Amino acid sequence: VLELCRTRLPDNMGIPADQIQVLSPTRRGLTGTVSLNRALQAALNPPAPDKHQKTWGELIFREGDRVMQTRNNYDVLWQKDDGEMGTGIFNGDVGHIAKIDPSGELLEIVFDDRTAVYTADMLAELDMAYAMTVHKAQGSEYRAVIFVSAPAAPGLMVRGVLYLSLIHI
């Protein structure tokens, strides 16, 4: 999975790593999104002296990371490049961390064409998004999808989960 995201798909098919989505039926275990996100972050966005980062719980948010909003927040202010402003970042919105101020208290996150500033106390609303569950990916589109699975709970290992992962290609 790491090699596919880091070199094989970008080099052989011209698909940038930020347009590749790894999907798993579960969050837990070796092939769950928690483990996959740790490994993918280390491979695709490792620490560097010129990258600021912020630790929150077990997560390390770093400039350049792909992140997902995990609950609706109707109060987050955002601004588009053309100056249009609005509020609301919603469960499942995926973006990337463009900037973390040196103190680590403010993070600038770009969601498609909207830029929002998050304070450190809002980090509970974010998760890494290099890998996500099939459930969270519903309704999204990606240039390339890598479906990762290993033996899991019987309820997760059904034909419908594979079907849902395939329709996101």
Predicted feature residues:
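Core RecA-like ATPase module of SF1/SF2 helicases and allied nucleic-acid translocases
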Residues: R6-I167
